[in-house]
Curated annotation (Swiss-Prot):
InterPro entries, per the entry: PCRF, Pep_chain_release_fac_I, Pep_chain_release_fac_I_sf, Prokaryotic/Mito_RF, RF-1
Pfam families: PCRF, RF-1
Family matches, as PROSITE patterns: RF_PROK_I
Family that this chain belongs to: Belongs to the prokaryotic/mitochondrial release factor family.
Domain of life of the native organism: Bacteria
Gene: prfA
Organism: Prochlorococcus marinus (strain SARG / CCMP1375 / SS120)
Subcellular location: Cytoplasm
Protein known as: Peptide chain release factor 1
SUPFAM superfamilies linked: Release factor
Length: 365
């Protein structure tokens, strides 16, 4: 993004910010809580941008003054040296600020602020793949708890020898999707399974889908499209187990998507969870269809977000986790303990780099 384009967009943001300030002072807005919240949220989003722009304007003014001082100091070597030092300092400040502002103005994914549902499925590898799916679930649970998110199992199909054939986890918190969206894809593990008697290394996989939570207004469900049946739960529930039909089996007839919920103690709670999962799955389906049509959007992403894309290999023998999109290795034990900040941070930085590169190409056209 060239400087003139950057400043034009910052001027627009400043004008919008000033207009929002006026609206907040309007008694009609103050008496409408919903409108007040919307305007206040947008103002809060723009405020750091506007403050940085004011700082950039102040630096520009100081730079002009330092340049004029340099011009007038040709006969005073000491003053000339001081003016040159000041120019270098201001150039560095401006460079850092322009980079920060450019990143702030990059196109945002409107889903970034949402909570998510993680769907983890065992892939190739039989029983070991199910155990691996469980290991991934624990990794995300540890990371979520570390950063203060609320992590809860929504639906699970347990495997006979441990782990899960399929598991859906709700992860609630601030901007969860902005960080976990990079986890979508195939996660491959290379290790000696606990069930392997001859010490041979096996390769197994699990797929992860990251589904932003869908608002009921956003994804409307027609009652005629739903087929709901109940069953006796086989999970935790004390005296409820196998005596009361608390499990809910939900089928969305137009798409064939089926959701089975047993995690909650009551049928009503399981029904609500099943509908929540279904909305997220339908929203993910819409997003995948849109991405398939919008190829250019994928060029500015770290990976496609497709659950069939192999994104990472976890090699136990070498204690190494390789992210194939970045071509970078991370310590295996650290990653599995839920220490994902470095890995996710690298994905975010790469996505920003690609977006800036794309903006630069557009500016040249």
């Amino acid at each position: 993004m060239d400087t003139s384009t950057l400043k034009a967009r910052l001027e627009t943001a400043s004008a919008t910010f000033n207009n929002l300030e006026l609206q907040l002072a309007d008694p009609d807005v103050a008496s409408d809580p919903k409108k007040l919240e919307t305007i206040a949220r947008e103002r809060a989003r723009l405020e750091p941008l506007v403050l940085d722009y004011k700082e950039l304007q102040a630096i520009d003014l100081e730079y002009k003054e330092a340049k004029e001082l340099l011009r007038q100091s040709k006969s005073d070597k000491e003053m000339e040296a001081l003016a040159q030092e000041e120019l270098i300092r201001l150039e560095e400040l401006e460079k850092d600020l322009v980079n920060r502002l450019t990143l702030a103005l990059l196109p945002k994914d409107p889903r970034d602020e949402r909570s998510v549902m993680l769907e983890i499925r065992a892939g190739a590898g039989g029983d070991e793949a199910c155990i691996w799916a469980g290991d991934l679930a624990r990794m995300y649970e540890r990371y979520g708890l570390k950063v203060g998110w609320v992590v809860k199992a929504m639906s699970a199909t347990e495997a006979d020898l441990g782990g899960f054939r399929e598991l859906i986890i709700s992860v609630k918190g601030k901007a969860v999707f902005s960080q976990l969206k990079f986890e979508a894809g195939v996660h491959r593990v290379q290790r000696v399974p606990a069930t392997e008697s001859q010490g041979r290394v096996h390769t197994s996989t699990a797929t992860v889908a990251v589904m932003p939570e869908a608002d009921p207004v956003e994804v409307k469900l027609e009652p005629t499209d739903l087929e709901i049946s109940t069953a006796r739960s086989g999970g935790a529930g004390g005296q409820n187990v196998n005596k009361v039909e608390t499990a809910v089996d939900l089928l969305h007839k137009p798409t064939g998507i089926r959701v089975f919920c047993t995690q909650e103690r009551s049928q009503l709670q399981n029904r609500e969870r099943a509908l929540e999962i279904l909305r997220a799955k339908l929203l993910e389906r819409e997003i995948e269809e849109a991405n398939a049509k919008e190829r250019s959007a994928r060029l500015a992403q770290v990976g496609t977000g497709d659950r069939s894309e192999k994104i990472r290999t976890y090699n136990y023998k070498d204690n190494r986790t390789t992210d194939h999109r970045l071509g970078v290795n991370f310590p295996l034990e650290t990653v599995l303990e839920g220490e994902l900040d470095d890995l996710i941070g690298a994905c975010i930085a790469e996505e920003q780099r690609l977006k800036m590169e794309k903006l630069g190409n557009q500016s040249e056209e």
